[in-house]
Amino acid sequence: MNKEEMNARQKKIRNFSIIAHIDHGKSTLADRILEQTGALTHREMKNQLLDSMDLERERGITIKLNAVQLKYKAKDGETYIFHLIDTPGHVDFTYEVSRSLAACEGAILVVDAAQGIEAQTLANVYLALDNDLEILPVINKIDLPAADPERVRAEIEDVIGLDASDTVLASAKSGIGIEDILEQIVEKVPEPSGDVDKPLKALIFDSVFDAYRGVIANIRIMDGVVKAGDRIKMMSNGKEFEVTEVGVFSPKATPRDELLVGDVGYLTAAIKNVGDTRVGDTITLANNPAEEALDGYRKLNPMVYCGLYPIDSSKYNDLRDALEKLELNDSALQFEAETSQALGFGFRCGFLGLLHMEIIQERIEREFNIDLITTAPSVIYHVNLTDGSNIVVDNPADMPEPGVIESVEEPYVKATVMVPNDYVGAVMELAQNKRGNFITMEYLDDIRVSIVYEIPLSEIVYDFFDQLKSSTKGYASFDYELIGYKASKLVKMDILLNAEKVDALSFIVHRDFAYERGKIIVEKLKELIPRQQFEVPIQAAIATKIVSRSTIKALRKNVLAKCYGGDVSRKRKLLEKQKEGKKRMKQIGSVEVPQEAFMAILKMDESK
């Protein structure tokens, strides 16, 4: 292909993604676009085609990214090449969304005609604007009885500030307006810029592990050209590989001779480790490297940690294998082995956020058949010690003694909640209970309000989302971003059973809430731990100070049953003997903590 043909081809390429809040119809719209452009026959079509994981279909969310190449014959008679890059919509995967948007020139913004703009719609629009994308608003689900397209159109103009005069009104389910969307993509989305003669620059926006071919990297070519046999280099770590195959997804993987500027496709190069193809990294040629990498790459660090332990300790090695397999596809997942006196052998795992954590746990239980005990999620604390050094703590059990701590800093997030104005009071009360600082509040229209708070991440990782949904009858939508660390009065609370610490039950809490939380946990454990032959004290302690205590009464055999009448000294002798036995038992007896006790503490609503 000569230079002119390449330039002509480049002018016909349109790269775009679809952004939307959960349940606004993103995957359905992608299905209709695939059908309309003839990528699939009606027979091959199944709903949510790009969401290939069962879990994605069930939860109705997109977790992994997918990219497809489509051909579309427009009304002007020309055939255009579309690359549709599917994005996850959830806040935990914000970085992945931003990288897949960086691979596009345009974005279709899908807004539900009944619900209007939600918190994550806004978050994703700002990401798209950061990447200078052309945004095409689409109001979806116009055939719903509750649809109010005019109100939503006004919201798009007022809240986001986009011109909504030529917004497409569509219904992905019924196939209304799909043609108009495709024509708008042709007219409004800019062609890819980039020069085929420059050294290769390709952005990795996702990677998956294949047992036979190694890592398959999804890439967008920004400059240059790549073909099988090229030696490539990763710009973040300098590692080199030889390309074995390049191709595109249409929607099945189809090998090609080469990928040119503007193309979105895949590349395999016998790469063994997903960690070598990090999302956002730049690929270049080893013998003719680009001078600088594409911007925006950063290493993903976990935000939330928790311990995963197999209920059946013989499955420890199976759990390690499961985590290693999941890590192949998910470079953000981190884990290391740890042991707990209470739970045995397991792993300390780091996740991007709560949804990420839930999905990994669910996949281990479902795909690998391992039943898990999970400890309470915790965040990463920065601890400044009295000797001037700093340490990072991600496990409450590792928190040093209070005497050597100068101060503790915890991560804060900026949380944006969108809610109907009837529930503003409930949301503000919840945020105050979670130690939130009020930042701002604005009315989006006469019904909806956007409220912004700064809240410690540790308060959100428990059950903030569940409580938010229940206090607003499910109407609130919520989005958060990390803003940095702030000093707080935090203390470590230990739970003692029969005067012994149970390491898996330790947690870090704000000093002002320590007494209430200690009291709740102690009462809860008293209900759940079965009675023993001896008295068991349960205590909640901060360092050496006990803040709450409860006692599980002993089970007692009636040793006097065999004395019919008889002398009182005989009875006393039997009672004394029983008392001695109980005392000895208490010294050597250990208390088994049932699985339910750990679960109850995790699920407990601690702010009450």
Swiss-Prot record:
Its EC number is 3.6.5.n1. Gene3D superfamilies: 3.30.70.240, Elongation factor 4, C-terminal domain, Elongation Factor G (Translational Gtpase), domain 3, P-loop containing nucleotide triphosphate hydrolases, Translation factors. It is found in: Cell membrane. GO terms for cellular component: plasma membrane. Its main location: membrane. GTP binds at residues 23-28, 140-143. It is an enzyme of class 3 (hydrolase). Coiled coil: none annotated. GO terms for biological process: positive regulation of translation. The keyword Methyltransferase does not apply. It is a peripheral membrane protein. InterPro entries: EF-4, EFG_III/V, EFG_V-like, EFTu-like_2, G_TR_CS, LepA_C_sf, LepA_CTD, LepA_IV. It catalyses: GTP + H2O = GDP + phosphate + H(+). Residues 11-193 form the tr-type G domain. GO terms for molecular function: GTP binding; GTPase activity; ribosome binding; translation elongation factor activity. Keywords: Cell membrane, GTP-binding, Hydrolase, Membrane, Nucleotide-binding, Protein biosynthesis. Belongs to the TRAFAC class translation factor GTPase superfamily. Classic translation factor GTPase family. LepA subfamily. Required for accurate and efficient protein synthesis under certain stress conditions. May act as a fidelity factor of the translation reaction, by catalyzing a one-codon backward translocation of tRNAs on improperly translocated ribosomes. Back-translocation proceeds from a post-translocation (POST) complex to a pre-translocation (PRE) complex, thus giving elongation factor G a second chance to translocate the tRNAs correctly. Binds to ribosomes in a GTP-dependent manner. This is Elongation factor 4. It comes from Listeria innocua serovar 6a (strain ATCC BAA-680 / CLIP 11262). The gene is lepA.
